[in-house]
Each structure stands twice: as C-alpha cells, then as structure tokens.
Amino acid sequence: MPVTSVYQKDKPFGARLNLSPFECLKIEKHSGGADALEFISNKYDALTQVLSRADILKIACHDCAAHALQAVLDYEQVFRQRGFARADIIKITGNGGGAQALKAVVVHGPTLNECGFSQADIVRIADNIGGAQALKAVLEHGPTLNERDYSGADIVKIAGNGGGARALKAVVMHGPTLCESGYSGADIVKIASNGGGAQALEAVAMHGSTLCERGYCRTDIAKIAGNGGGAQALKAIVMHGPTLCERGYSRTDIVKIADNNGGAQALKAVFEHGPALTQAGRSNEDIVNMAARTGAAGQIRKMAAQLSGRQ
C-alpha cells in the first residue's frame, strides 16, 4: 500500500509529536527520513492510537521508516487478532525492512503455525534485517532440514539472525558434506547461528580439511566458526597460522585468539606486531592473553605504535 503524504505548511514535521531537533535529525539522517517525519505529522492521530511516542521514534529511526509506519497501520489489527502483542509488532518493525517483515508475517504466519512454529518463533525470525526473506526461507527449506533431523528450534536459531535466509540455504547446501567430514548437526547449527553464518559454513567446507591436516580438531574449527566473523577467522588461521607456529605460538594459542568476534583482525595484528612486542619484552603468553579479547587488534596496534615512538 502506498504511503500517504500531504505537506502541511503550517506545522513543522514532527511538531505534533513534540520531537526535539536532535530526534528530528536522528530520523532525517536515514534514507527516507524526511518522508518519515512528514508521515508522522500527517498520520499523528492514527499512529498514536496504536503506538506510543517511544514506539514511533524507534520505528522512524530506520531507512524507509514511512513504509514501516504505514505497515503498522495496515496490519496492526490482523496481528492483534492472531495473538501478537504490540511489543511484537514494534520488534519486527524496528529494523531495516520492517514493512516487508510485517507483511511476511501476515502472509506466511498461518502456514508457519501449521508447521509447528509458535508466534514467539515467528517474531524471533522476523525481528532481524532480512526477516521477510528468513520467514520465506523457513517455509522453503524447513521440510528438508526436518528430514535431516534438524529440529524446529534449530531452524529458528539459524533463521533468527541477520542473513538467516542465506544461512538456512547454506545448511541445506553444505550440511551433508560437513556431516560426512565428521561435524555433528549441533556443530552445524552453532556455526550457522550467527550473522554471517552462511559464509562461516562455506569457510568450514573450504578450509576445514586444510586446518585438520595442520592439527586443528573439528571442535576447534566449529568453535572458531561459530562467532561473528568466523569465516574471516578461519581464513586468517590458514594464512597466518604457519608463521605464528614458527614464532613459538601453539595451535591452542591460535585457537584462543581466533575464538572471538574480531578474531581475524586479532590474528593479523599478532602476525604484524608480535615481533615488536616480543622485542619489547612481552612473552608469547602475554601477547595471547592480550589478543584473545574482543577489540584486541586495535589495542595491539596502539601498543606497537607506542613502542615504535619510544625508539
């Protein structure tokens, strides 16, 4: 349904909602932000019947928010009739692509219920960027995954992330090969259940055999891959692992560094700046403890720069 928009010359957009200049700016900086402010001004009475001021702000602070707000007006009654709470509507709509996600819940929700998914499951899947595609992917790939002994809970866990649709498709594509390579269904779910899960599964399929040949166990590989940026971390081990081992780091050390969000960057930082830190008296154990933290790459670079400045 098209977004209704009538310019009101006598009232600044957002004035009826008492938006501060900062709040207006927060909305305007998004794609379609001016349209969102105009829509709020024009549809103030209808919006405030179903949404609080905080709800409207939350939805409006995303790209294409006018369409999302219109979708709330279009579908709110249907959602209530199907047992969804207002909080569910806000969760689904408060993401990029919220309008499409709401429509997808209306279209696919009944079928998903028939397949055994609860309202809470549907909200969890839809409440992400790309939620509409993820709901459709559950319908498309769910039966195949069930036949392969993945539970409904597994499917929701995989689908309920940014990029969930791609992750489900990747499980269908790479799952059989990974199982033949010795990974369990639980391993595959763990790897897939992250933003970037599809890329992580592909990276395991691509680099897993090389890493196993170098002495890394599948448990280590699944553990590393099951983090945000897991695909990059596995590739970083393939690239930098041999050199780090030559410098006295053990595989356990490398896994410890890689097994974090930002693990790839941390490994690269140790590879590039480790020698300088060693020359300054830091032991490998010190460097590993420093690197095995989220955001460690920046800290290592900063420390190396400080040491360089003293020379």
UniProtKB/Swiss-Prot annotation:
Core repeat repeats lie at residues 84-116, 117-149, 150-182, 183-215, 216-248, 249-281. Keywords: Plasmid, Repeat. InterPro entries: Ankyrin_rpt-contain_sf. This is Burkholderia TALE-like protein 3. Belongs to the transcription activator-like effector (TALE) family. Bat subfamily. Cryptic repeat + repeats lie at residues 282-311. It comes from Mycetohabitans rhizoxinica (strain DSM 19002 / CIP 109453 / HKI 454). It comes from the Bacteria. Signal peptide: none annotated. Cryptic repeat - repeats lie at residues 19-50. Does not bind DNA, probably because it has too few core repeats. Cryptic repeat repeats lie at residues 51-83.
